[in-house]
Amino acid sequence: MINVSFLGLMSGISVLLKTTVIVVGIFEGSNHLEDNGALEGYNDKIMEIVNGYQSFDGKFAEVLPIIGLEKDFPVVVVIGLGKSEDFDENKALKVGGVIYSELNRMKVPDASIVINTDSNVSANIGYGALLRSFKFDKYFVEKKDKNSVYLNKLVLFSKNDPQEVTALFNDLKAEGESIFLARSFVSEPPNILYPETYAQMIYEELSKVGVTVEVFDEDYMKANQMMALLGVGQGSAKKSRLVVMKWNGGDESESPIAFVGKGVTFDTGGISLKPSKGMWDMKYDMAGSASVVGIMRTLAARKAKVNAVGVVGLVENSVDGNAQRPSDVVISMSGQTIEVLNTDAEGRLVLADALWYTQEMFTPKLMVDLATLTGAVVVALGNNQYAGLFSNDDAIANQLIVAGNESGEKLWRLPLDEAYDKLIDSSIADMQNISTKGYGADSITAAQFLQRFVNGVPWVHLDIAGMAWDYEGTEICPKGATGFGVRLLNRFVSKYYESH
């Protein structure tokens, strides 16, 4: 993780001259740099060079390196900030990520950033660089050049009190460290991360920041009649686990917010076997659980004034002679029976018991579940654009949508309706785990299935199948695991439910 620090703009040019690279911003169409005078007599020279490049006019994320401004003068990198009226937290995040990528490509060890913005935006520029600096390279015997990290230190010069900016950044950094943890979990191969080892990793990592963690085995789940969850893992040599995380930062009398995650550490599809091509991606079928771990760690790390509980069901969906069969009937913790027609629609079975358990044990004020639940949501919304949102509560759904827009982790609400609910009625049990009546609406019928295990509690289901893994990378996330949901839920809690 890159080291980010802050100084005041009044520190002067002498401090800037000690760095390898100076990064300065310019808004689209502007005739001056956003340095607030920090570069003193060099502005005109830089602008003369900038104006000489007709292809560069300050559009968002445009980059122009300037070498040899003067003898022994640092390399100057001018970055376009786009239109000034559009520059906000999310743009600042992306600018920070672009700066990191460009400087790392240039193989420089350190740099200073001079962009004349307020404290919050300055902190987010640093945060964007931090988020983009994630690397999962532990399994390389020799680091290849493209996987090397060169940039280790960034200093941002702010017009505001650097202590104020640092305080804002430290809260963001706590969130960022949690996102890195979530990304790392999702990136781990399934022979390393499986229910037993994953549960132990959660315990070790979250105990460090004050989260109370309990790990429950299969005997405990059998005693609680969690046969929907256990049925998913019965074809695997890896034993299923239930992990409960608690953070009590609010009033003792206050009911907690609950986060529930699907943790299928590898999904073969079971007897309803997936095609071999692309099955390697199914190590990230536990991304919902990683997001729950991430938000619980974030709340504890920044000492959030809220009570929260996280519950994740951890299973491996594999195939052997004891594997669950299409047409099996299982009894869930709720007492409702489920006809399992497709063993590859397993995540909803895990969540069915995890949701019911959460309500029974903790009486939460609301529940949010996260799951890479359906490929259909990717068909509907695409990759890395919007997660699907389903809810029985309009107010909470709208709060999450606002939090998503503000954090950049956007949500699109999809319907719940009796017309869809009846599609999962079974002829021999209370319900079946897929619709067999025609085609389409698979994400909706999956959400309808989950709703049958919500007992009078405000609830939101987030289908993050298209958001958990980025095959190309973004300004703030390299190719791979995204940690989607942590920033969204942290904003949701701090904006609407935390005591300030």
From Swiss-Prot:
Q: Which reaction does it catalyse?
A: Release of an N-terminal amino acid, Xaa-|-Yaa-, in which Xaa is preferably Leu, but may be other amino acids including Pro although not Arg or Lys, and Yaa may be Pro. Amino acid amides and methyl esters are also readily hydrolyzed, but rates on arylamides are exceedingly low; Release of an N-terminal amino acid, preferentially leucine, but not glutamic or aspartic acids
Q: HAMAP family in the record, alphabetically?
A: Cytosol_peptidase_M17
Q: Which residues bind Mn(2+) 1?
A: D267, D344, E346
Example of a GO cellular component annotation carried by this entry: cytoplasm
Compartments, record wording: Cytoplasm
What cofactor does its activity depend on? Mn(2+)
- Positions of Mn(2+) 2 binding: K262, D267, D285, E346
Q: What is this protein called?
A: Probable cytosol aminopeptidase
State the EC number(s): 3.4.11.1, 3.4.11.10
Coiled-coil stretches are none
Give the co-factor note.
Answer: Binds 2 manganese ions per subunit.
> Which residues does UniProt mark as catalytic?
K274, R348
Q: Name one GO molecular function term.
A: metalloaminopeptidase activity
Going by the entry's taxonomy, the superkingdom of the source organism is recorded as: Bacteria
